[in-house]
Amino acid sequence: NGAHLRIARLAIDTGYEAPAVYAWSRKVGCAQVAPVKGLEGFNRSSPVSGPTFVDATEGGKRLRRGARLWTVAVSTFKAETYRFLRLERPTAEERDEGAAFPPGTIHLPTWVESEWLKQVVAEQLLTVRTKRGFAKLEWQKLRERNEALDCRVYARAAAWIAGADRWPEEKWRDLEDQL
């Protein structure tokens, strides 16, 4: 409807330039920004864990416990994303009769570009054999560019960190009323 929404929490990947990310997140503040590190695998007790305090450097000087780092089980959120993309959506006729979208539906704008859609489905989950012969699940790229999928995964992690998974119905109604 054109309403402007504020960012509740922003997750930023530390994988490429961790010192710069730590410095920027300290400057902006930990209430708004969550430096994250993605880990593969489904054997995590929680999709997001932390924060843990890590050492950071600023201007060549070591800052002990200078940054808060969140760990994200990216496989969990990728699987959730693909599951939500497969949800059956109600038709326009069904919506006119009061049918709602299922929880988790990913709503895409009509103006979304095909390149973005290709990126959001740029990986597939395969069963591969380890060197010792055991089967394990692994995400493999179908195409080189997958930034849209990564952004969705880290946005979902930011929602988790902000506590959206534990918000009561009343909180969601309050947010909806602000639109």
Q: Where are each of the predicted segments found?
A:
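Mg2+-dependent endonuclease catalytic cores in nucleic-acid-processing enzymes, primarily RNase H-like
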Residues: 1-132
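Long, compositionally biased intrinsically disordered regions
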Residues: 103-179
